[in-house]
Regions:
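Mid-domain Rossmann-like dinucleotide-binding core that forms the NAD(H)/NADP(H) cofactor-binding site
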Residues: 127-195
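Glycine-rich beta-strand-centered segment in the early N-terminal region that forms part
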Residues: 21-38, 51-94, 217
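Short, well-ordered loop/turn sites that connect or cap secondary structure elements
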Residues: 82-83, 139, 230
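Short glycine-centered segments of the SAM/dcSAM-binding site in methyltransferase folds
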Residues: 87, 144, 168, 234-235, ...
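NAD(P)H dinucleotide-binding glycine-rich loop of Rossmann-like/cofactor-binding domains
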Residues: 45, 56, 65, 87-151
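C-terminal hydrophobic helical "lid"/dimerization subdomain
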Residues: 273-324
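Short amphipathic alpha-helix with an adjacent loop that forms part of the alpha/beta core around
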Residues: 197-208
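Glycine-rich phosphate-binding loop and adjacent beta-alpha segment
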Residues: 221-290, 324
């Protein structure tokens, strides 16, 4: 099978095309002929050698993420009448940057009719985390939510899902193109993070009380600046760190004094069955036209290094996916 292989830690150039033996389905697995591959910013950081304390990954390795495709073979304990030839998505980590993937059958999510495999791939991870965050923070109709990184793969989904829950949505994005996209997706107000004074503009957009929920997918200084915008008794989620400067630093004394519930990425580590349930919800919403996937660029698998460079360049909106 064809793969994109990280030969050593480093820049995007270390991600090279290679050939590996085709996988064989284990007893409770299927083999998926991959159509499109979901990419995650964290994979660019792992490739660069970061987060070794969280991810036990050593080169050479095939990066992980998610795939969409068609089941081509089934293991001895898998019913081929149910799964053979079926369009599916699945989280595959490591090993998703490949033309074939062996996947446990209980990790599969069928793709409904009317939804393309490219769009389905873009939902493998981000939609699951987005739905989990909204469930975890218990965002309700009539509440106000501040979403940083609102033009990214998960941010674009959060904007739509929060709006669908009846919340008032204030997005934070950088630059006029990204601001326009977030507004188009349904945000009531959008603040341009390119302005050094963006926290003041966000405070004005939120009103005097602040945000009932802050969903910070950026981290670093921007995430830290978003924390004071949380209302008394609100919920603050620090779940993203694409800046390379870590998750948002939250002063515990202030959080306690203002009765703010602080959540992190550890709070959305989900069981396979929970992931499947949330992904099923997301695919159904997308197939019905109620959830739009924003795909900023598509690169062939052989150019995965270029895809990583584009992701790190931060110029694109939405998701970057790989085609096989």
């Amino acid at each position: 099978m064809r793969v994109a292989l990280v030969e050593k830690f480093g820049g995007p150039e270390v991600l090279i095309p290679a050939e590996l033996p085709d996988p064989v389905a284990g007893p409770d697995e299927v083999v998926v002929a991959v159509d499109h591959i979901d990419t995650l910013f964290v994979q660019t950081q792992i490739r660069a050698g970061a987060f070794g304390e969280y991810f036990d990954v050593k080169p050479p390795y095939v990066p992980g993420g998610g795939v969409s495709g068609t089941v081509t073979s089934t293991g001895a304990e898998v019913d081929p009448a149910v799964w053979a030839g079926r369009r599916v998505i699945a989280a595959v980590d490591p090993g998703s940057y490949a033309s074939l993937a062996a996947v446990p059958v209980d990790h599969l999510v069928p793709v409904p009719d009317g939804l393309g495999l490219r769009e389905a791939a873009a939902l493998v991870h981000d939609s699951v985390t987005a739905l989990a965050l909204l469930d975890l923070t218990a965002l309700k109709a009539g509440e106000t939510v501040l979403i940083t990184g609102a033009s990214g793969g998960m941010g674009t989904l959060l904007v739509q899902l929060a709006r669908a829950r009846g919340a008032r949505v204030v997005g934070v994005a950088r630059g006029p193109e990204k601001v326009a996209l977030v507004r188009e997706l349904g945000a009531h107000e959008v603040v341009d993070a390119a302005s050094t004074d963006w926290p003041r503009h966000a405070a004005e957009a939120l009103g005097g009380a602040g945000a009932d929920v802050v969903l910070d997918g950026v981290g670093g200084e921007l995430g830290a600046a978003a924390f004071p915008l949380t209302a008394h008794g609100g919920r603050f989620s620090a779940h993203g760190a694409p800046t390379g400067h870590g998750f948002a630093a939250v002063p515990a004394d202030e959080a306690g004094r203002r009765a703010i519930t602080v959540l992190g990425i550890a709070d959305v580590q989900l069981t396979p069955s929970r992931r499947v349930a949330l992904a099923t919800r997301a695919l159904e919403e997308a197939a019905a036209g109620r959830l739009r996937t924003v795909i900023g660029a598509v690169y062939p698998l052989e150019r995965a290094g270029e895809a990583h460079a584009a992701i790190e360049g931060r110029g694109l909106v939405g998701k970057v996916v790989l085609s096989v």
